[in-house]
A protein has these predicted regions:
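A short acidic/basic microdomain associated with nuclease active sites
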Residues: 35-71
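Conserved alpha-helical elements of sugar-nucleotide-dependent glycosyltransferases
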Residues: 25-33, 105
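Conserved catalytic cores of phosphodiester-cleaving nucleases, focusing on short active-site segments
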Residues: 37, 66-91
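N-terminal targeting/trafficking signals and adjacent low-complexity tails
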Residues: 46-50, 85, 93
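Acidic carboxylate-rich catalytic motifs and surrounding loops in phosphoryl-/glycosyl-chemistry enzymes
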Residues: 49-52, 120-128
């Protein structure tokens, strides 16, 4: 009986630590996007979704929106970004995939996309604050929730410091023209 209690206790804390680690990686990737990809040189940050701690005490309805809302400083166009970081790809080449959006998230983001464009930023590999690859795919091109294959993300890859180490990180911000071209591949 005591052994079962200890096992349950171990599983509970293992999952708790695993979830905390996953959330931390997500936060680091979000910081990377704001600091290096969607820089204040090109974009104003209009909205940042509440963290889980705020929602624990009182649920904030706007938490159902994507993580960020930006405004292009050149054209004044507004758009949303949902950030997803995954440490590694699952499956074997050439059919590698990641799990990334639930059905309800995809439905919500497609509704938001009817008013303002929604992009899903997917970071993979290396560290969350400096991923190997970053993909920025308009949600309107995502047909199925839960998992997405690497081969479907490749056309939406953006340059980053890992891919081009000779570049300085501040030179790798995503210019607005490159952002808007993604809507018309």
């Amino acid at each position: 009986m005591i052994r079962r209690f200890i096992d349950a206790f171990d599983v509970f804390f293992y999952r708790l630590l695993q979830e905390s680690n996953s959330k931390r990686k997500g936060q680091l990737f979000e910081e990377h996007l704001v600091d290096w990809i969607f820089t204040k040189e090109y974009y104003d940050l209009l909205h940042l979704t509440q963290d889980g701690y705020t929602n624990f005490f009182r649920y904030v309805k706007s938490s159902e929106y994507p993580d960020f809302k930006f405004q292009d400083r050149i054209s004044d166009k507004k758009f949303w970004v949902e950030a997803k970081y995954r440490t590694e790809w699952l499956g074997d080449f050439p059919d590698q995939y990641i799990y990334f959006l639930t059905e309800s998230q995809l439905e919500r983001y497609k509704e938001v996309d009817k008013k303002l464009p929604v992009f899903i930023a997917v970071g993979t590999g290396n560290k969350a604050h400096n991923p190997n690859q970053i993909y920025l795919i308009p949600v309107r091109f995502i047909k199925v929730a839960y998992k997405i294959y690497k081969k479907h993300l490749l056309p939406f890859e953006i340059d980053n410091a890992f891919k081009f180490p000779q570049e300085k990180k501040h030179e790798l911000a995503l210019p607005p023209q490159s952002l808007w071209e993604r809507l018309d591949p």
